[in-house]
Amino acid sequence: MMRILLFLATNLAVVLIASITLSLFGFNGFMAANGVDLNLNQLLVFCAVFGFAGSLFSLFISKWMAKMSTGTQIISQPRTRHEQWLLQTVEQLSRDAGIKMPEVGIFPAYEANAFATGWNKNDALVAVSQGLLERFSPDEVKAVLAHEIGHVANGDMVTLALVQGVVNTFVMFFARIIGNFVDKVIFKTENGQGIAYYITTIFAELVLGFLASAIVMWFSRKREFRADDAGARLAGTGAMIGALQRLRSEQGVPVNMPDSLTAFGINAGLKKGLAGLFMSHPPLEQRIEALRRRG
């Protein structure tokens, strides 16, 4: 909770600075001179409220959504020795990372994958695919679990949601400025907002949202290196490298993780060229090399 409060305070400061900057550069006067009567401060606050509301709501229901979308079965009472080992391993890693033990689950998927989610590092969920349990060695599975525990301990789910909230705020803000400008200056709408405002705003939100997603994905990729580093500390560098190498050998297996969980899985598939800017995970080769440099 403290992380959320501190991050929200930081982002409120960003919104305040943005408002002051627009005023200092005379943006309000520029808009008024062109016939656009728009209170930018009120608009910025409105966009911040709705931008963060959607992001934080998604965060608070993330565990429930993850279970529903992946078919994850929570292990409350282990029925097999593999489930017993899984619970014991997560319990040990959580203790070493200084967090409360998360819920542990298995989801039915042939692909080798795992994810962590939850609004609080002491109220999280870690789940692994059936395919990963069947084909990976115990050391490799432990390293994957350590990576996911690293996400939880670092508070990555909260931070990523709040970064998304900032992005949402400014996408909504600038899309509405563009919509008002086109409506008032180009189409000369005098009373209220014309159809041009709504069409332009929707189009601008789509374009700006697409471009802004590259910022969120850049942050997500940085976050993966930190989780790999945490995994190496908890399970050993050799085991973490081995798990990533094993994932690399399975890159031909389609990744069917729901879009809402892709950023929280250990394996997100492979994209090349400009599409790489919109990847939630760095290439496995870069992650392996970073761990080797770590020593």
Swiss-Prot record:
The record places the active site at 148
Which pairs of Cys residues are joined through disulfide bonds in the record?
none
Q: Which domain of life does this protein belong to?
A: Bacteria
In short, the EC number is 3.4.24.-
* Protein known as: Protease HtpX
Cofactor(s) for this UniProt protein: Zn(2+)
Single GO BP term: proteolysis
* Keywords (A to Z) from UniProt: Cell inner membrane, Cell membrane, Hydrolase, Membrane, Metal-binding, Metalloprotease, Protease, Transmembrane, Transmembrane helix, Zinc
Q: Which family does it belong to?
A: Belongs to the peptidase M48B family.
Which organism encodes this protein?
Answer: Pseudomonas syringae pv. syringae (strain B728a)
Tell me the organism's taxonomic lineage: Bacteria, Pseudomonadati, Pseudomonadota, Gammaproteobacteria, Pseudomonadales
Q: What detail does the entry give on cofactor binding?
A: Binds 1 zinc ion per subunit.
Topology in the lipid bilayer is annotated as: Multi-pass membrane protein
List GO terms (cellular component aspect).
plasma membrane
Originating gene: htpX
Tell where it localizes. Answer: Cell inner membrane
Is Cytoplasm there in the keyword field? no
